[in-house]
Amino acid sequence: MSKAFVAIHCETGKENPIIRKLMEIKGVSEVTGTLGLYDIIIKVEAADSMTLEKIITKEVRKIPNVLTTMTLMVI
């Protein structure tokens, strides 16, 4: 099982719609709104690192109004 935490910076005021979309993504196991440089932190889990990468790059980063992400792989 591969895991990562992803910090998400998004357009101001768009946090709640993004949080709702994130909760619909298979593999996203936790979603938390935060204050500071990043607006949302998520935990992503997948069977392997390749699947994990696809979830982050093809689904999370493609959500409208997501500006930047920082991925922290769990070792």
Name the predicted role of every residue range.
Residues 1-75:
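A compositional/biophysical signature of low hydrophobicity enriched in polar/charged and small residues
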